[in-house]
């Protein structure tokens, strides 16, 4: 199978190349075009618009996008230019392609909801907050509008069970909404958390009892390979590990991996919220947005994608995957 991966040089893209290149021919589409092991050739976005510049492609995995900026320094229009605009461009190319039959778009759980009081399901009415989630949901809507013209209803796409509508043109589309992605080599909020705990600094947010879903990059690779190789119905699919963990449990996983004792302080929530507010003013690592990410409840159901793939569990459980991620941090 000839597979085109946009954003091929990113964290998820690099992992997908390793996972898929053994049995497929991988092409890249990115803003930079250095050579990469496992990738036959990487094209520029300008080449996408040139006649006969691209090879015959069987499947597209669209990862290219602007990630969530927890420091809030990015202009809103940049999110829409990248997350919405590039999605429209590559999706239009997919729909016009004579050979491509599978399209996987990596959206985000934040496109569905900023906060989740109970469990996030695919049929939720999207209520994103901020340009990151809003730009992703606008990209989703562009895709859904096009699919309706091919006989695939929004209801079928967002059903909590795999849908039954088949596109008239035979082109399947999968919209993945992953929660926080982790894996060896990834940087982000987990790396920040690791930096605090590994230095023996007590964790001051123990008073926040929460549960959240994480997403192992290995499980993402497994799911992508599944929809590419199996007869999986088009649809919106939440992506996450099987188990939800609290931040306190995550601290314990980090300490266990490092052979350290966990020091969790249960400082009153009101005081810590005030500290985060000051951190936002002074542009410190702990600001209100990062505080929310570390303490919020955000549990996402992965029942639909597992049913579509015909599995009961993903290959990597949350604790196992997080330990692998933390062990990688420790080697750096």
Descriptions of predicted regions:
Residues 186-192, 206-228, 234-235:
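Substrate-positioning beta->alpha
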Residues 3-23:
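N-terminal Rossmann NAD(P)H-binding glycine-rich loop of SDR-like oxidoreductase domains
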Residues 89-131, 147-157:
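Conserved Rossmann-fold NAD(P)-dependent oxidoreductase catalytic core, especially the SDR/UDP-sugar
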Residues 129-156, 162-174:
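Active-site Tyr-X1-5-Lys
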Residues 217, 252, 275-312:
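Conserved C-terminal active-site "lid" loop/helix of NAD(P)H-dependent oxidoreductases
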Residues 45-84, 89, 93, 111:
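NAD(P)H-binding glycine-rich loop region in Rossmannoid oxidoreductase-like domains
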Residues 162, 230-286, 322-326, 330:
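Mid/C-terminal beta-alpha module of Rossmann-like enzyme folds, strongest
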Residues 304, 312-332:
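Amphipathic terminal alpha-helices
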